[in-house]
């Protein structure tokens, strides 16, 4: 059985116990949290192997057929370029300026109403975005005051979607100038429908994700329940296939998974061969 739950939901199910009624593996678009590891221990899931399967980037994307224009009505031929601070200002609940348009944030940006569809709290993409963008882009005053940098505004300019990326595409296609937050693999497989803004002047690319020069790059993981190894038929066949050269250099690469560096890959293979507990 394969079930789509989001990273948070997957860890919750994975940690609930050992046995055929519980998952063997959970995929996660961010590292397991300490509180999730503690939940696993409470559920009797004591031995866990962490597998870093590749890298990903988070795209701040809009409809591919939308033409951005500056405040003078002139076409922005190079697309739109946003900083983490500008995205935070557009999305943050505790931004006292409460901008209505991107122009309200910076005069170089278009007079287009801010409309952003964000992943739900259960999503690992949401966790990674909040850590890499909302927290990093948070204004100094908020950090000093120990405010909640990751809280989204609730006035209609930011809405939460579900786990189905297709709904995000539908939203930004209908509402021109709207943004959605996607993983790179989804962007790369839907370039006819969606395009990504630059972040801090850097375009999203496979190379930029692999070397982390793209500002919203992140690792991807799955977690193996060691108690199921040797009990559940085919479990290690699946794991070994997932990290094989054939997969990572062929069909997973075609699907948008960005490869690990040789050094990182060697560590992953060693951890799998020795079924090394990650904690």
Go through each PLM region and give its residues.
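Flexible loop/hinge segments at secondary-structure junctions
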Residues: 1-279
């Amino acid at each position: 059985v394969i079930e789509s739950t989001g990273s948070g939901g997957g860890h919750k199910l994975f940690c609930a116990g050992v046995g055929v009624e519980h998952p063997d593996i959970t995929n996660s678009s961010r590292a397991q949290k300490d509180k999730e590891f503690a939940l696993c221990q409470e559920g009797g899931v004591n031995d866990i192997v962490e597998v870093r399967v590749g890298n990903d980037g988070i795209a701040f994307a809009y409809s591919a057929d939308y033409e951005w224009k500056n405040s003078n009505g002139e076409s922005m031929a190079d697309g739109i370029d946003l900083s983490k601070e500008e995205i935070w200002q557009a999305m943050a609940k505790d931004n006292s300026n409460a901008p209505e348009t991107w122009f309200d944030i910076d005069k170089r940006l278009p007079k287009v109403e801010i409309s952003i569809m964000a992943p739900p709290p259960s999503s690992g993409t949401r966790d990674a975005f909040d850590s890499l963008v909302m927290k990093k882009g948070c204004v100094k005053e908020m950090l000093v005051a120990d405010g909640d940098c990751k809280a989204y505004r609730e006035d209609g300019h930011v809405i939460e979607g579900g786990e189905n990326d297709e709904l995000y595409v539908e939203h930004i296609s209908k509402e021109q100038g709207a943004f959605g937050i996607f993983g790179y693999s989804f962007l790369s497989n839907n370039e006819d429908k969606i395009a990504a803004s630059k972040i801090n002047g850097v375009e999203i690319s496979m190379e930029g994700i692999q070397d982390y020069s793209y500002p919203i790059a992140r690792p991807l993981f799955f977690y193996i329940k060691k108690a199921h190894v040797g009990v559940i038929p085919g479990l290690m066949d699946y794991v070994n296939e997932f990290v094989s050269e054939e997969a990572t250099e062929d069909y997973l690469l075609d699907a948008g998974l960005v490869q690990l560096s040789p050094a990182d890959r060697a560590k992953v293979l060693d951890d799998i061969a020795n079924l090394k507990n990650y904690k």
